[in-house]
């Protein structure tokens, strides 16, 4: 399965799940299959999550828009991303500007089956090696292992066993909060599941209106790049989105601040 086909399968699986599965008291993080999918909802705080593996064409715009507004975000990058020389300036900027840097697996492997989620597709040792290699790549940028606590699994797809193995490494597995189409910003115009930036933007604001807690505690996931298959880049709406949400009283914080 190609990375793009795998991502399509992930989106279909996630979007088929009922939102009621994530409801919890306002003061507690919400969990699914052992992973955190939403932070406390008592305050108007949002944790923006950005994952990256092969592409990074949106990263500079994202960082610029955050810097203009004094916002903080969290970036989860694979080892392959971190070892790509062309991406090194982006990684250094993420760190220098005070954002969180965490792992997203080393090689972006599929950890569990799409249709039988409880079926893990690799051994515990292979999993640990993959994550540890990613952590070493992060350490290569001067971010010590002790400062890395939260991580997002590849394809944003995992099961309870993967969450448990993560805890064995001293890591807390987190994912994105369902209810918007933000994570579909990787889809290309030629894909059957393409979601335009306008639809993504509208879905986020619709969720803010409809959820009893708005977007408080949200883990809102986007990508640092979608590649050449998508001309309609979501980063063109990112600054506008930040302004609208800030106007409604939201602050943009790192995941370790939201979940501490």
Locations of regions flagged by a protein language model:
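Active-site beta->alpha N-cap acidic-glycine motif
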Residues: 27-118, 132-149, 233, 244
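Catalytic domains of cell-wall/extracellular-matrix polysaccharide-remodeling enzymes
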Residues: 61, 85-86, 108-221, 225-246, ...
């Amino acid at each position: 399965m190609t990375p793009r086909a795998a991502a399509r399968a992930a989106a279909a699986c996630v979007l088929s799940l009922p939102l009621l599965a994530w409801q919890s008291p306002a003061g507690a993080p919400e969990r699914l299959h052992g992973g955190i999918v939403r932070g406390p909802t008592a305050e108007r705080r949002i944790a923006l999550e950005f994952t990256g593996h092969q592409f990074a064409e949106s990263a500079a715009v994202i960082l610029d828009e955050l810097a203009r507004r004094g916002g903080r975000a969290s970036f989860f990058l694979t080892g392959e991303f971190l070892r790509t020389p062309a991406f090194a300036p982006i990684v250094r900027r993420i760190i220098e500007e005070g954002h969180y840097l965490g792992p997203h697996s080393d090689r972006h492997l599929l950890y569990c089956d799409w249709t039988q989620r409880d079926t893990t597709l690799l051994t515990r040792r292979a999993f640990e090696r993959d994550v540890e290699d990613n952590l070493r790549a992060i350490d290569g940028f001067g971010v010590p292992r002790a400062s890395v606590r939260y991580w997002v699994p590849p394809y944003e797809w995992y099961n309870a066993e993967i969450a448990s193995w993560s805890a064995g490494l001293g890591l807390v597995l987190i994912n994105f909060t369902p209810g918007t189409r933000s994570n579909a910003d990787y889809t290309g115009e030629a894909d059957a599941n393409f979601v335009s930036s306008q639809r993504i933007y509208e879905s986020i604001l619709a969720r803010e209106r409809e959820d009893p807690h708005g977007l408080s505690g949200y883990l809102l996931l986007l990508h640092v790049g979608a590649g050449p298959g998508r001309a309609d880049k979501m980063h063109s709406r990112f600054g506008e989105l930040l302004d609208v949400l800030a106007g409604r009283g939201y602050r943009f914080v790192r995941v370790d601040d939201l979940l501490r």
